């Protein structure tokens, strides 16, 4: 039900509680200590959030469906919810514009919100509130295990920021995967070395467990219809939409992952197999990033599965590290470095994003598969993002801001606080090593080792020149040549740069011309 259908005589509004599309937890700090008789929840669907980047239709549908289910759940609890639907008459189609309309109509004494997950949105709402002359209280997001202040304290005085030290600190603080003496289970903090398996020539097992799917209910079906109508030119297959959009369904998805895929997740988390988008991955990032799932319950479920013998330690630790370590770490980086972080471009990359990133039409089998499932489903797992789509853009020298905007647009789990550092820093090395200690670059042989993509591809990963040369391999050697002076200063790149000496002047020229 829209805001227009809710209008009528009501009690004076004390506080307008702003709820954004990635803040769908009932225990959000904005709702704490609220008076349901005098406070009002405000939510708005606006085209701006799907058009500031060319958002995929599955991504837009996920946000709107989850928002509407949150609205209905709060109303069932007795909250008054002022909800602006995408097709409401008079919708200004911007968050700032809809906030102005709500304040002018409801006249709240003040505004309260949980800190936004996007700097652009935070600035827009802050500016709108200031222009209206209404106080805005911004509260810490309690969903996370590390506050922005705690991350600032962690980073203070350090010459370098590295995930591993941060991760160990949080393991100790929250007593996760520790023994009675406070030491890491298994005698080591990190089992990454055990988690790099591929499927070999045989591929994944025939009984590979499919993730639990969630058929759209009436609310979600209406959203799918609306998104198809309003965003016909945007990418994405709405017929395949099956994401959890409520906390109940998100918990079922978590239970399904823990029972059926986490036991093999660690070993195969970096593996790729054409036509198999899910493999042993959790599909939980979107639910967590919209706050349908609390990371504490996800971590607790994985740890419990290890302690009672259902999951080995490398799988449990590898999965927990992605959440407790990487997810919290990138958020800290984002808020510490914004707003200038999006413009970082350490390598001076200025190429345009290839058009096939929006069509999936390329002869490179690995890219065709990763892009195809991304554009269709709004999903690719982390190695496809880092070492296929991200690697190609890095080697080609695509402008990092363009790569960032593509990642933010196409993936259903993309919220800027988590997507931008992963793209700008980890994938594109545009921050010069703030996020990652070296650029993650490789020839096509890496993809050959971790997938079956090369077997049916017309390009040869072991060739760098000639008509059959793999573009990844050619661009790898070109990348090393272009950035040789910079990379020489990085000890972790020493061996790769040294290998340039194996190329004759003629080979170097051929690589550049290819």
What do the predicted segments below correspond to?
Residues 2-86:
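N-terminal beta-strand-loop-alpha-helix module at the start
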Residues 8, 20, 252, 271, ...:
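C-terminal catalytic domain of photolyase/cryptochrome flavoproteins
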Residues 18-21, 44-45, 84-86, 113-116, ...:
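Short His-Asn-centered micro-motif
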Residues 23-25, 90, 115-123, 394:
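Gly/Ser/Thr-rich loops at beta-strand to alpha-helix junctions
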Residues 62-82, 112-113, 377-401:
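Hydrophobic/aromatic-rich, well-ordered segments within soluble, folded domains that form packed cores
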Residues 94-243, 424:
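Beta-rich, aromatic/charged-enriched effector core domains that present basic-aromatic interfaces
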């Amino acid at each position: 039900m829209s805001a227009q259908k809710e209008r009528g005589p009501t009690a004076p509004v004390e506080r307008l509680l702003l709820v954004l599309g990635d803040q769908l937890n009932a225990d959000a700090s904005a709702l704490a200590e609220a008076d349901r008789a005098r406070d009002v929840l405000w939510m708005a669907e606006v085209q701006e959030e799907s058009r500031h980047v060319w958002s995929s239709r599955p991504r837009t549908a996920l946000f709107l469906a989850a928002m509407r289910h949150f609205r209905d759940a709060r109303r069932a609890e007795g909250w008054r919810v002022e909800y602006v639907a995408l097709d409401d008459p008079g919708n200004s189609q911007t968050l700032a514009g809809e906030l102005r309309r709500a304040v002018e109509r409801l006249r709240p004494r003040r505004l309260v919100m949980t800190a936004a997950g996007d700097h652009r949105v935070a600035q827009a709402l802050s500016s709108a509130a200031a222009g209206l002359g209404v106080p805005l209280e911004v509260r810490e997001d309690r969903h996370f295990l590390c506050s922005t202040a705690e991350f600032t304290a962690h980073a203070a005085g350090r010459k370098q920021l590295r995930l591993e030290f941060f991760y160990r600190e949080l393991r100790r603080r929250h007593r996760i995967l520790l023994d009675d003496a406070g030491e890491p289970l298994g005698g080591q903090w990190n089992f990454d070395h055990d988690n790099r398996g591929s499927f070999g020539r045989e591929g994944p097992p025939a009984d590979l467990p499919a993730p639990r799917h969630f058929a759209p209910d009436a609310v979600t079906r209406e959203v799918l219809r609306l998104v198809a109508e309003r965003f016909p030119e945007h990418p994405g297959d709405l017929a395949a939409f099956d994401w959890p959009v409520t906390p109940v369904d998100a918990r079922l998805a978590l239970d399904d992952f823990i029972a059926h895929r986490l036991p093999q997740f660690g070993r195969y988390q970096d593996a790729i197999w054409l036509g198999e988008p899910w493999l042993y991955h959790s599909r939980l990032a979107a639910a967590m990033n919209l706050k349908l799932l609390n990371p504490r319950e996800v971590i607790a479920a994985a740890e419990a599965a290890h302690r009672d013998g259902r999951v080995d330690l490398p799988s449990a630790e590898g999965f927990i590290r992605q959440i407790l370590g990487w997810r919290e770490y990138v958020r800290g980086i984002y808020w510490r470095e914004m707003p200038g972080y999006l413009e970082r471009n350490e390598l001076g990359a200025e190429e345009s994003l290839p058009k096939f990133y929006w069509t999936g039409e390329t002869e490179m089998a690995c890219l065709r598969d990763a892009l195809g499932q991304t554009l269709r489903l709004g999903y690719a797992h982390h190695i496809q993002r880092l070492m296929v789509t991200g690697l190609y853009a890095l080697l080609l020298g695509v402008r990092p801001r363009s790569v960032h905007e593509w990642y933010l647009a196409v993936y259903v789990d993309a919220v800027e606080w988590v997507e931008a550092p992963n793209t700008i820093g980890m994938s594109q090395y545009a921050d010069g090593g703030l996020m990652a200690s070296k650029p993650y670059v490789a020839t096509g042989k890496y993809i050959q080792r971790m997938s079956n993509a090369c077997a049916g591809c017309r390009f040869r990963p072991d060739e760098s020149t000639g008509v059959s040369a793999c573009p990844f391999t050619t661009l790898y050697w070109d990348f090393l040549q272009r950035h040789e002076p910079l990379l020489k200063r990085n000890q972790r790149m020493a061996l790769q740069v040294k290998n340039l000496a194996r190329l004759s002047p003629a080979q170097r020229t051929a690589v550049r011309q290819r």
